[in-house]
């Protein structure tokens, strides 16, 4: 037996070197050659940014472009005409940022001229500005490439700050993106050049730790952009912004992750237009007309703080009602009269406001009030109508599969035995999740903090009931009122229930 084991052991030892070779780490890469930008004059001579990009494009993967701080701050390069498109792999680094936090600015004002958003024409004649199809006058262009890294730059005063078109595996981090007044601060799009989506061309890009200030749209994920990460950024608009549209717009973009960002003072903090399975988590939305405006299917809004907006989450109708999930969000202090409606927002007379509102009109609806984009046909007869009840014809149905809010009926018991009872309606013989929230005020109608969740089922008639243990925990004890949502097995979350006062 010992001899047999020794033979086996020797055989394993013989093949281990081969296995190790098969799984060894990637060999070290050759060091990159540095192209140093130490002149801010826009010409083709050595030392200029234009020269550096042109040189790097001739041998992708060989170079790192380092832009030095020349003279005294602020450090500004003003191209006189569009720069060459960037071919990766390549790094473009503003060197002063890592040293003292100063950005090197690339400023488009020398050739992007005109009044306001009229300086940025769209792809269709007569249209201009944000929220019309455009790839006009971008600052830095990543098209049909990969492996580009941008860091330590301030990119400002273009129509699009950075255009990422049919490009993947790029990283844009630790930059300032300022006052790009047409398409977006950063636009990630699979646009095929004719307005159609391409499904696998704009993937696995990372947009992290940037500051987006006073862009029309801060960032766009459109026309097939998928599996991209947008994390730890600030998206902010101020009164200086002529067209404060969206912090982020997702249009026909799927499976993107948007996490730990801040969205401040836009028409919509984030707007999803027929995008699917996007994951929106741990963000903060404040001061927006609508915090999140949503269509599409399978999107998850999870663990966000949504406070001080007109509407917290606005769920828009679409031709076929589809499920979207809202879970573990803190939603409070909304319902403000913020009428900022540049291709989004809530300005319709009598518009309901609050934490979660179904049936909010968007640009696609006849009842929308606001700008659909400069030069866009506003004829309401060409727009969709919203159904006000189930079973109506010639209108778009209630969103989120029409899932109705639960009803909270009573709190029973004392101390550790205290429990919340409620009921809801849904699909017969189906599984549901009920999520319960606490509010400080006795008439609090939002979701100030999460108390927990409980599973429930419907019977053959679609009637469901639930019991949620409140116990003696501090969160439950501090609540002056309770609210709840119910989410179906398909992932369709209801609006919040009417509050149940505890005092």
Where are these regions (language model features)?
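Bacterial N-terminal signal peptides that target proteins for export
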Residues: 1-9
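Bacterial N-terminal signal peptides
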Residues: 8-17
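N-terminal, post-signal-peptide segments of secreted/periplasmic proteins
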Residues: 23-161, 166-171, 324-477, 483-488, ...
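The right-handed parallel beta-helix/beta-solenoid scaffold, focusing on the short coil/turn
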Residues: 33, 63, 75, 88-90, ...
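Right-handed parallel beta-helix
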Residues: 107-249
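Short glycine/acidic-rich loop motifs that flank beta-strands on beta-rich extracellular proteins
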Residues: 110, 159-164, 181-188, 214-223, ...
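Edge beta-strands of extracellular beta-sandwich domains
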Residues: 491-503
């Amino acid at each position: 037996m010992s001899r047999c084991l020794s033979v086996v052991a020797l055989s394993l030892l013989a093949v281990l070197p081969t296995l190790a070779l098969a799984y060894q780490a990637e060999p070290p890469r050759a060091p990159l050659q540095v192209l140093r930008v130490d002149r801010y004059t826009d010409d083709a001579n050595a030392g200029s940014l234009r020269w550096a990009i042109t040189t790097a494009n001739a041998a992708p993967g060989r170079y790192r472009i380092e832009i030095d701080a020349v003279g005294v701050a602020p450090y500004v390069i003003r191209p006189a005409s569009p720069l060459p498109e960037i071919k990766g792999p390549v790094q473009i680094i503003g060197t002063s940022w890592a040293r003292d936090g100063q950005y090197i600015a690339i400023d488009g004002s020398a050739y992007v001229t005109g009044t306001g958003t009229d300086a940025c024409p769209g792809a269709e004649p007569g249209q201009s500005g944000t929220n019309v199809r455009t790839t006009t006058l971008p600052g830095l262009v990543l098209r049909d490439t990969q492996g580009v890294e941008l860091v330590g730059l301030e990119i400002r005063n273009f129509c699009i700050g950075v255009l990422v078109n049919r490009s993947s595996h790029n990283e844009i981090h630790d930059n300032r993106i300022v006052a790009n007044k047409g398409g977006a601060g950063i636009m990630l799009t699979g646009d095929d050049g004719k307005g159609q989506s391409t499904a696998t061309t704009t993937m696995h890009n990372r947009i992290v730790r940037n500051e987006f200030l006073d862009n029309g749209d801060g960032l766009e994920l459109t026309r097939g952009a998928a599996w991209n990460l947008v994390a730890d950024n600030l998206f902010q608009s101020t009164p200086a912004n002529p067209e404060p549209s969206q912090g982020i717009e997702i249009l026909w973009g799927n499976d993107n992750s948007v996490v730990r960002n801040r969205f401040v003072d836009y028409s919509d903090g984030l707007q999803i237009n027929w995008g699917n399975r996007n994951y929106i988590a741990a963000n903060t939305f404040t001061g927006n007309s609508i915090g999140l405006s949503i269509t599409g299917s399978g999107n998850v809004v999870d663990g966000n703080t949504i406070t001080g907006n007109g509407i917290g989450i606005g769920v828009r109708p679409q031709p076929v009602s589809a499920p979207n999930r809202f879970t573990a969000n803190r939603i409070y202090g909304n319902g403000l009269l913020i009428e900022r409606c540049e291709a989004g927002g809530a300005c319709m007379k009598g518009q309901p406001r609050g934490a979660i509102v179904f049936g909010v009109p968007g640009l696609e609806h006849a009842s929308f009030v606001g700008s659909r984009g400069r030069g866009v046909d506003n004829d309401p007869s060409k727009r969709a109508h919203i159904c006000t009840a189930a079973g109506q014809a010639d209108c778009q149905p209630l969103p989120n599969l029409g899932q109705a809010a639960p009803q909270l009926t009573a709190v029973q018991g004392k101390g550790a035995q205290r429990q919340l009872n409620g009921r809801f309606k849904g699909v017969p013989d189906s599984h549901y999740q009920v999520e319960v929230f606490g509010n400080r005020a006795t008439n609090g109608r939002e979701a100030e903090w999460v108390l927990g969740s409980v599973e429930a089922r419907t019977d053959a008639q679609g009637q469901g009931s639930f019991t949620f243990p409140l116990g003696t925990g501090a969160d439950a004890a501090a609540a002056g009122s309770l609210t709840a949502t119910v989410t179906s097995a398909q992932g369709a979350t209801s609006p919040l229930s009417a509050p149940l006062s505890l005092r």
